[in-house]
Amino acid sequence: MNRITNNKTIWVKPKCVEKKWCMIDASDKVLGRVATEAVKILRGKHKPYYTPHQDLGDNVIIINASKIRLTGKKYSQKIYYRHSRYPGGLRSDTFRTLSERKPTAPLEIAIKGMLPKGPLGRELFRNLKVFAGSNHMLNSQNFYKLEAN
């Protein structure tokens, strides 16, 4: 790896970093636990040369997002809000209705909320692929599996 060292600080060039693919199976796992593990990998915090202002993380594939689990009564009581930007345009959905309509949405919303706001966060979010079932179109990638708690 090509890097510039200045005393003890390591500056890694983003084009020298090899991005790997990580697969997380979300079946029967708690939503927040899976989301935090995915964000750690997307940001690159699992690597020794983590830099907060660069995209040094790996790509993440999450399968079985429709089988994700929640604790407590959140399945029927957790409310997701969105606004249409028109007067009186506040809309709300419970976890149940949102996951029936789009099974990957709750996990994507949780991960997007944990990423930095701004251009870097949008770039990191593009490195995430979430699938409702176990079938995915990225079979040609060499990925390593991660067991989330």
UniProtKB/Swiss-Prot annotation:
One example GO MF annotation: structural constituent of ribosome
Disulfide bridges in this chain: none
Cellular component GO terms, alphabetical: cytosolic large ribosomal subunit
Gene Ontology biological process: negative regulation of translation; translation
PROSITE patterns, A to Z: RIBOSOMAL_L13
Record's keyword terms, sorted: Ribonucleoprotein, Ribosomal protein
Domain of life according to the entry: Bacteria
Keyword Nuclease attributed: no
NCBIfam families the UniProt entry points to: rplM_bact
Assigned protein family: Belongs to the universal ribosomal protein uL13 family.
Function according to Swiss-Prot or TrEMBL: This protein is one of the early assembly proteins of the 50S ribosomal subunit, although it is not seen to bind rRNA by itself. It is important during the early stages of 50S assembly.
Subunit and interaction comment: Part of the 50S ribosomal subunit.
Protein's name according to its UniProt entry: Large ribosomal subunit protein uL13
